[in-house]
C-alpha cells in the first residue's frame, strides 16, 4: 500500500504497487503524456518502474534537465537501432550522453562518410516517427550475456564480463528488433526523440586505450523541441565562424605544427596581443600589491617528490636527464615560489607576501585532447602565490575575488559562475587540514555574497579551489580563474615564518590565477570578439592610406604622429584603389582606417572610417590621436561612434 509524496508535499495512496507512469496518470492525462521518467527517493527511474514502498516522487518531463539528458541517451539507442538496420554487421560498443548530445562508438568494416551519416539520420527519423514504445526488460547476467552472444555483440559481452557483477540484474531496452543494455532510464516512447542531428564521425579507441582497436565514434545532438535544436545549430554555425583557429590564421596571429604538438608559434600580431595582456595584468599586480618573480622552468626530481607532484602528477610531466640526474619541466609554478619564499628569514610582520609570475609551464596532455590555443602543452600562466597566516585567509581570498571580477569586467565578461571544488580521493594532507581549507574558501565566498556550486572531489591533490567560469556571447562557459588554498605544500617544502612569540609556523599558501593560461585566454577572447579586438588589444590600431601617390608624404607624416604617441599604426601606400585597401583592412579587423586625400592635406586632417564600415568624418590629427590614446588608456571595448 505505497503512499507517494509529491514535490508540493501532497500525498497519494495506492492499494497496490504502482508504476511511475500510473502515478502521473492519477494526477492528470496531460502530465502522463509528458512523463519521460521519474525521480523516486531522489533516484532516476524509468516510467514503467514499479514503486512498492512509501516513496517521494518527482515526475521528469522534457522541460527538466534530467529529461533532456534521457532524451539524448535514448537518441543514442535510436542511432544504434538505425545503424543496425543499415549496416547489419556493425558491432555496438558504448553510447553515453555528453554535453549537448550523445555519441556511439561502433565497430564497422568500412569508414563512415558524410553520406552515411545523412542516411543514418534519415533512418533514425523514420523510426522515431513511428512512435514505437521502448520496452525495458530486466534479466539475469547470464541471460544478458546469452542475448548478446546470439546477436554477435563482443563489446557488450566485454562490458558484462568486466564491469557488471554476476549477481546483477541488467536492464535490456528493446527498440523493436534492436536490443541495447543500459542502466537507464530511457524514454517510454520514441515520440520524445524527434529533434536531433548527427554531427560528425571521429576515431576512438575501445576503452580509451591506444592498445585497443580503433572504433568510429558518431556524434549527435538532441533537444526537446525543434526550436531548441534550431537555436543550438545556429549557435554552432556562429561558433564555427568565431573559431579562434580560423581567425588566428586569417589574422596571422600564430600557427602550430606537427613537429611541436601543443606548442604555439606566435607571429608578430599575436605576440602583440600576448604582450598587451601581460602589460595589463602587470598594472593590476602593482595595484593589488604583488611582487613579480621568475623561477626556473626545470627542477630536480627530488623536489617534485617532496611536493607530491611526482606521485600524483607524473603522467602529465615532461622529464629529462643530465649528468645522472633526473629533471622535470615544471607543470606549475608553486614549488618554485616556495623556494623563493624560503630564502631569508620571514616574520609574521612580512605577511602576506604576494608573489606573481608569468610562468612558462608544460604539461604532457594527450595528443588527442589538444585543440588550438584552448588545450596546449606549453603555456604561460598568470600565476601568483600568497603566503599568509590563517587569520589573513578571508581578507586575502576576498582581495583575489575582487581582482578576478575587476580584470574580467575589462574584457566585457560579466556573467561569471563560481564553483567550489572539494577534496579528491587522490590527495595529500590530513583530513583536518582539508576541513580548514574548505571552510576558509567557503567563508570567503559567503562573506562576499557570492552564490556558488559545490563540485565534490574536483579539487587539486594539494588543496580545494574556487573556480571562476566565464559565460561568453554564445552561452558557453570557460573556466579560467582559480583560487586555491594549500596547507600542505608549504609544510612539505619547509616554509616557515617567525610568529609574534618567536615560534615557527608554516604559512598558508593561496594559489591564484586569473586569466589562467594566457594562450587559452587569447583563444577565448578571439572567439568572444570574433577577431574584432578592442582598440587597446588590436595588433594594428590604425592604418593610414593614400588615394594617389601625391599624398604619400602626408601619410608618412600622420603615421609618425600616431607612432610617436605610442599607437600601433602602419601606412598603406600601395598603388591600389582606396576602396580595395579599406576592404582588405576591414577583413583584417583593423579598428580605424585613416584616408588621406588632397582635401585632407589642405585642411591638415584625416578622414576616419571604422572596421564596421562607419564613416566618422574628418578629424584634426591631434584630436584623433588624443581620442585614440584615451580609448587605449581606458581600455574601451567599443570604437568611436559605436553605441
UniProtKB/Swiss-Prot annotation:
Matching PROSITE patterns: AA_TRNA_LIGASE_II, TGS
GO molecular function: ATP binding; metal ion binding; threonine-tRNA ligase activity; tRNA binding
Main location: cytoplasm
Matching Pfam families: HGTP_anticodon, TGS, tRNA-synt_2b, tRNA_SAD
Note on cofactor: Binds 1 zinc ion per subunit.
Annotated ranges, domain TGS: 1-61
InterPro entries: aa-tRNA-synt_IIb, aa-tRNA-synth_II, aa-tRNA-synth_II/BPL/LPL, Anticodon-bd, Anticodon-bd_dom_sf, Beta-grasp_dom_sf, TGS, TGS-like
Chain intervals for the UniProt region annotation (Catalytic): 243-534
Protein name: Threonine--tRNA ligase
Species of provenance: Haemophilus ducreyi (strain 35000HP / ATCC 700724)
